[in-house]
Amino acid sequence: MRIGKLLLLSAACAALSGPALSSTALTQPAGDLARQQATAQRVQITRDDWGIAHVHGKSDADAVFGMIYAQAEDDFPRIEANYLTNLGRTAEAEGEKAVWQDLRMRLFVDPADLQARYDRSPAWLKVLMDAWADGLNYYLATHPDVKPKVLTRFEPWMALSFTEGSIGGDVERISLGELEAFYGKPRMQASAEVRAREFAQAVAFREPTGSNGFAIAPSNTKDGHALLLINPHTSFFFRSELQVTSDAGLNAYGAATWGQFFVYQGFNAHTGWMHTSSTVDVVDEFAETIQSQGGKLFYKYGAEQRPVETRAVEVAYRAADGSLAKKSFTTYRTHHGPIVRAADGKWVAFAMMYKPVEALEQSFLRTKAVDYASFLKVAELKANSSNNTLFADDKGEVAYLHPQFIPRRDDRFDYTKPVDGANPAADWKGLHALSEAPHLKNPPNGWLMNTNNWPYSAAGPYSPKQADYPRYMDSVGETPRGIHATRVLSARKDFTLPTLIQAAYDPYLTAFADLIPTLSKAYDATPDGDPAKARLAAQMAALKAWDLKWSADSTQTSLAVFWGEALWARSAAQAKKEGASVYKYMAERTTPAQKLEALAEASDRLSADFGDWRTPWGTINRFQRNDGAIVQTFDDAKASIPVPFASGQWGSLASFGAKRYPGTKKYYGTSGNSFVAVVEFGPRVKALAVSAGGESGDPTSKHFLDQAQRYADGALRPAYFYPDQLTGHVERNYRPGE
């Protein structure tokens, strides 16, 4: 029987025209390769002159097969890295240092559980997961030069480990230091040193992850068509830009996170969707009172003593000699969730959404929505916990949706801190109905926005009212980018795609509009005899004359950013301890002396690193892509491109998260604006877009860096959505495997 199967497989291999097959092909079960070859014949991939894949399949499953194959062509290492992360298997590639990261994921992700969930999935979804695995395995089979670090074969159920396309999942809120202290030997509460280190990391200046989304109603556009800004702020090269279509009605264009078979932020012929990381509080900690009785563990819940669940978890890791070793853990769980740390004599359980099947359904089905009603019907799956949505369609509808997975809780409790797990009143009480969250549709002002700020300014004066909702609907408040978005969206009622781009790249830095006057006041109040008065006179004159706008030539931007970072370092820790806004603390709570000391520090650092405190911002702030590594090494001696826009922390809508790296004086960006698109929903959808660097992760490809200058300039290019738009812009037509 087995010999017969091998003979059939050998015959199939011999019949294949095209590249030599890898050993992966020979290890597949008999029939898999033949099935994959047959699917490939129903798929067409067209690469445009930017290297972007336009994938067409007869069925949705065929399209998924081609979509994931094309992604693998562009950057298989990032696909594998994402699944190693989400399966809890990173340590098998990176070694023992990643064990705690993997254990954190494995508290939720269990391969046997995912396989069972796959078996119970709707038939249509199983077909897509099967096609996804086939596409990746066929890529590996036809590319013998590609050597996976770990995942030499993909199984359909693995797709359920990575169902939501945002940059950081809820699970990442679990402290690795606290987790190691609890599950290490001996078990203990995290040390003061660990907590201090993690606190310092939490308050350090860094680029906020998230996104900008604007939806403009027809009443505020020149041509009477709804417009949408799609502007995710992620780590660079985190997503693939592509189009995926089928004869079954699939036709989605936009950004897909590497390894996923749905367009996460994008549009189809009728609707567009933009997700922004939400400030809603949907992740909670419950402090459990643990007792040992008869050698078993119990936790208090009301008048009950409930047994603590245990589960054995083995985490494999790559040893120094290259072999695989394992660490074994006994993990603990209550009905609230897994235990992730100890604090104040209690064990802390972590509660978050875990609905992988529904999440994958929702992520795919919304790409086929034809209007707001059908989009909202998909949202009723309530499997999105972490993202707001800005929506627009060709009916002229615009909308803002808060996340749909929002546990109903007793608002008397402060869920920003661990609540008493023994008190049933603190438990989750089901989920809120969509109508109970701050959603908006077609507000009279004609625009909607979110920039990872609260929902209570989403539509200017027509926004939801904070008093109407529980406290946990927002945990951040307003932000400099939110204030900036309101400013640009309120400024006109005749938006077009070009003017929407102008708004998205408006150079005003709202945070400094509040901060610089406090610095001026501190300086003006300084006695004339104080040495700082004369030393900082030129710097203050420059900042007082500044228009608060970034540009590559602006020396004031450099000085203001360096001053802001220095003052942040003096403010953030205490602001966090007091639960205060860092910006408010910087403006109101730092002393005049601290403000001036920070300015002197900024001036000195500019002079030391660049020879003059009057250094243009573009000389410092650079985009560099010199290799295809997931974690890049930057080098001042290598070519780079000046970027005029600044950090979103200062209110820049076009965000560029940059800093110094070991051995560099210049700042290099690694996050912020990544994929940017503007879309007009007229009789024919029209879109312009740009991606950081280029579509390919291969440094030898001409599409590795071909969009870099456009990215820095904010010069979006046409997105070829219709076949006639591709005419004259096609580099290659082929089928997978050719």
Each PLM stretch: what is its role?
Residues I68-A93, G294-Y301, D420-L431, S435, ...:
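Short, solvent-exposed cationic patches
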